[in-house]
Swiss-Prot record:
Name of this protein: 1-deoxy-D-xylulose 5-phosphate reductoisomerase
Pfam family, one: DXP_reductoisom
Binding site for 1-deoxy-D-xylulose 5-phosphate: 125, 151-152, 186, 209, 222, 227-228, 231
UniProt cross-references to SUPFAM superfamilies, sorted A to Z: 1-deoxy-D-xylulose-5-phosphate reductoisomerase, C-terminal domain, Glyceraldehyde-3-phosphate dehydrogenase-like, C-terminal domain, NAD(P)-binding Rossmann-fold domains
Entry's Gene Ontology BP terms: isopentenyl diphosphate biosynthetic process, methylerythritol 4-phosphate pathway involved in terpenoid biosynthetic process
Molecular function as annotated in GO: 1-deoxy-D-xylulose-5-phosphate reductoisomerase activity; manganese ion binding; NADPH binding
Cofactor(s), names only, from the UniProt record: Mg(2+); Mn(2+)
Entries under PANTHER family matching the protein: 1-DEOXY-D-XYLULOSE 5-PHOSPHATE REDUCTOISOMERASE, 1-DEOXY-D-XYLULOSE 5-PHOSPHATE REDUCTOISOMERASE, CHLOROPLASTIC
Function: Catalyzes the NADPH-dependent rearrangement and reduction of 1-deoxy-D-xylulose-5-phosphate (DXP) to 2-C-methyl-D-erythritol 4-phosphate (MEP).
Organism: Hahella chejuensis (strain KCTC 2396)
Residues annotated to bind NADPH: 10-13, 38, 124, 126, 215
Keywords, in A-Z order: Isoprene biosynthesis, Manganese, Metal-binding, NADP, Oxidoreductase
InterPro entries attached to this UniProt entry: DXP_reductoisomerase, DXP_reductoisomerase_C, DXP_reductoisomerase_N, DXPR_C, DXPR_C_sf, NAD(P)-bd_dom_sf
Organism lineage string: Bacteria, Pseudomonadati, Pseudomonadota, Gammaproteobacteria, Oceanospirillales
Binding of Mn(2+), residues: 150, 152, 231
């Protein structure tokens, strides 16, 4: 029996994780579940899965939540704050930590799991984007077992030889004959929109992803291609690659989740229906395979698969992410922070969709990029970038009528 802490249990990744775990009650037990603000969903999780701990980001609604659990006869202990999340990630009773908190908020509890040498199912790409080498050095130093569960990175992982799957190893993938990684992207709902059409899109349109069921923030990131930019940075750190050896392909069907090219001309691809339970089940059970509850892929009904090159002129977020990785240091943390602030402003109706990359670029140009030599340095860069992004949004919002 493996005990699992799920950071971000009420989000789409967290719910998918719990669905897979519930299919295998003889293998997995929920140790702790964390939530930001969705207390109703966390209450349902406590009723169904009976975790030892339920952890809230803040004490908002704490008393009422505790009372609901008591009235329901649930003995789950309720705790609050980042420190409690870190303890749930590093507890000696915990075998697996699912890092599914969206954004920079997931960094500290994810690093707590790394520093405790846990098996970490990494969905929180921002933690790795922000800290890069610091994160991977900690994985190696503490003997953590890192398994990516972003569908694309999990696909790359599955296409590697067994010897190349040990991400704590310093060996370059070139030693295993890998020449290129082909990172796929759906292209989002605006793939064929003109620049004029992009100026008119609404948050509701941006959140309607054509293939995946995701949260609002990541749906907007997918629509802007920033999600793919962050994933490119994540792939470079996870697999010790350069941006030149990672090629982004738009693949609107979202059936091939990524590919790995080898020196002999072979390309291995991981395929499947777009359902996050597949990579989650892979991470939970690795090196075994378990039922994820996902429908088998019917290639006859699909018929054709399509590929396109991304347009970095219409979708400059991908270019900005690439530039941030090339700049190095705290630049990726700056881009990530500015994007989080800009996306929230777009969702609130304060700026247009096309203003998101403008805010990011202004923040990147204004910020002082320094060596990411400590977590504290990265967190400070994140804080300052958020301030710059807010200033840029205030400037833009002054003369913008948002549809």
């Amino acid at each position: 029996m493996r005990r699992v802490t799920v950071l971000g249990a009420t989000g789409s990744i967290g719910r998918s994780t719990l669905d897979v775990m519930a299919r295998h009650p003889d293998r997995y037990e929920l140790y702790a579940a964390t939530a930001h603000s969705n207390l109703n969903e966390l209450f349902s999780i406590c009723i169904k899965h009976r975790p030892r701990y339920a952890i809230l980001a803040t004490d908002a609604g704490l008393a009422g939540f505790k009372k609901r659990l008591r009235d329901a006869g649930v003995s789950t202990e309720v705790r609050v704050g980042v420190e409690a999340m870190c303890e749930a990630s590093s507890a000696s009773d915990v075998d697996v930590v699912v890092a599914a908190i969206v954004g920079a908020a997931g960094l500290v509890p994810t690093l707590a799991a790394v520093n405790s040498g846990k098996r970490i199912l990494l969905a929180n790409k921002e933690a790795l984007v922000m800290t890069g080498r610091l994160f991977m050095d900690a994985v190696r130093r503490h003997g953590a077992e890192l398994l990516p569960i972003d569908s694309e990175h999990n696909a790359i992982y599955q296409c590697l030889p067994e010897a190349g799957q040990h991400l704590s190893d310093m060996t370059s993938l070139a030693a295993y004959g890998v020449t290129r990684v082909l990172l796929t992207a759906s292209g989002g709902p605006f793939r064929h929109f003109s620049q004029q059409q992009l100026q008119q899109v609404t948050p509701e349109q941006a959140c309607r992803h054509p293939n995946w069921s995701m949260g609002r923030k990541i749906s907007v990131d997918s629509a802007s291609l920033m999600n793919k930019g962050l994933e490119l940075i994540e792939a470079c750190w996870l697999f010790d690659l350069t941006p030149g050896s990672v090629q982004v392909h738009l693949h609107p069907e979202s059936i091939i989740h990524s590919m790995v090219e080898y020196v002999d001309g072979s390309i291995l691809a991981q395929m499947g229906n777009p359902d996050m339970r597949t990579p989650i089940a892979y991470g939970l059970a690795w090196p075994e395979r378990i039922d994820a509850g996902v429908q088998p892929l019917d290639l006859f009904s699909i018929g054709k698969l399509h590929f396109e090159m991304p347009d970095k002129e219409r979708f400059p977020c991908l270019r900005l992410a690439e530039e941030a990785f090339s700049l190095g240091g705290t630049a990726p943390a700056v881009v990530n922070a500015a994007n989080e602030v800009a996306v929230e402003a777009f969702l609130q109706g304060d700026i247009r969709f096309v203003d998101i990359p403008v805010v990011i670029e202004k923040s990147l140009l204004k910020g002082s990029i320094v060596d990411a030599d400590s977590v504290e340095t990265v967190i400070e860069a994140d804080r300052v970038a958020r301030q710059y992004a807010s200033e840029a949004i205030n400037e833009l919002a002054g003369g913008v009528v948002v549809p």
